[in-house]
């Protein structure tokens, strides 16, 4: 069944004038879109043992709200929020959530549930399992995510992740497609005019480049099991057929979509790259396609070491400044042929 590639494009008017932003989507996302923080719930029964508390603090990044009572984490730099549910005193909603989890997986306590979000309301599970399995999960850090972050901070506009499939011929076909199409797109794509003018300023010293690369992840790489399982859960049918998956990632580790290898073609790659490299006409993050990957990277400090960061991007519910926002308009980004 054909996928529909949709992006919401928002127009802000002052009287009859249109306030345009000429910054490319990938750069606007890099400078202004904070990654969505995940929600973490630790189910336990009675007080945690000392070794369990030590394990929790050892395996989770320090930028998790609720992990330590002695440290305050700035919300905009938080990777997530951790809450504790003691099943001996849990309320009805918490018990219902736990009962659903314990029916589908190991119910050994302590048990951690990690949930992400698409937009402001839609939650989906990122990982779940006993605390004893957390070390092998590599929730926030892996070699691929370290390299992907390095490339994005060095100026790559989009990093295309390639998760290999079971069929080596299909894997090689996707490699050849990426090897051919990405240099072609670098020559074809032109950035919007007016970058640097009032309303379209750049704030980071990261070079603004028309540069696209791909990063391969072996499906059997245990160090990348978190990413592989996440992408596979989004495309289970294609994964069961052994297909490779391709994921364009931009900004601060935002995945645009998980694309089966059988659907990747030059037209689709061009359409998606034009969207990500075009003027950011929708500054509201939640109204753009994609979802944020869990990455232990302090983007703010890396991008703005001197503290000269841009004003925060608007989110749903915030006004558009002077004047009124026109109704959002749907832009269909076709799959290609």
Which residue ranges define each predicted feature?
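Bacterial N-terminal signal peptides
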Residues: 7-17
